[in-house]
Amino acid sequence: MVPSDRDRVLAEAGVSRETAAALDLYVAQLTRWQAIKNLVGPATLPDVWTRHIADSLQLLDAAPQARTWLDLGSGAGIPGLILAIAGVRNRPDLRVDLVESNARKGAFLQETARLTGAPARIHVARIERVVAGFRGVDVVCARALAPLPQLIAWTAPLLKSGTIGLFPKGREAQSELTAAREKWTFVADVIPSRTDSSAGIVRISSLSDPLP
């Protein structure tokens, strides 16, 4: 029997039965709320386990020691809520903060975090306001939110103080890195995506002040 996308993703991730059940609940919530609020691209919902679950889970391996995460523009909880659901079973001290300015999407995040028991705090606010009050977070991440130069501008106070940035990108990764280097000095690498051969996770660290 050919395994389903769900079974394959869960097997590759090596999650517990409890985590699998929590991720199933997340997918059920996403499907239910999708009819009310367009949380993800409709064409991606049939491939939710690869396009969204597996694509999010690979970020855990990009920062294996991280305990505190800040997810910007979380929307449907991708990747932040998925990371919180999956990561807490192996990392009891994990904490994920999700930032989403849309109130209805924020309501989805609140309800789904409660139902799944995810260690997530939801901030229904603008990114600039939340980032200004954060220090000491291990990782800041964002998927499908903005070009890399804008992401760096939003997160500069964190990246300059030791936080690592993890930003999934598609074919535009290298061109966005080139544009960002015209404004900032930083260390970067691109981790190949496991779910899309044309995509990668841009990892940013050691940011310094903008170039003159």
From Swiss-Prot:
A UniProt-annotated Pfam family: GidB
The protein's role, per its UniProt record: Specifically methylates the N7 position of guanine in position 527 of 16S rRNA.
Protein name (record): Ribosomal RNA small subunit methyltransferase G
EC number: 2.1.1.170
HAMAP family on file: 16SrRNA_methyltr_G
Subcellular location: Cytoplasm
Major subcellular location class: cytoplasm
Family the entry assigns: Belongs to the methyltransferase superfamily. RNA methyltransferase RsmG family.
Keyword vocabulary terms for this entry: Cytoplasm, Methyltransferase, rRNA processing, S-adenosyl-L-methionine, Transferase
Gene that encodes it: rsmG
Species this chain originates from: Methylobacterium sp. (strain 4-46)
Catalytic reaction list: guanosine(527) in 16S rRNA + S-adenosyl-L-methionine = N(7)-methylguanosine(527) in 16S rRNA + S-adenosyl-L-homocysteine
Domain of life: Bacteria
Presence of the UniProt keyword Transferase in the record: yes
GO cellular component, one term: cytosol
Molecular function terms from GO: rRNA (guanine-N7-)-methyltransferase activity
Positions contributing to S-adenosyl-L-methionine binding: 73, 127-128, 143
Keyword Cytoplasm among UniProt keywords: yes
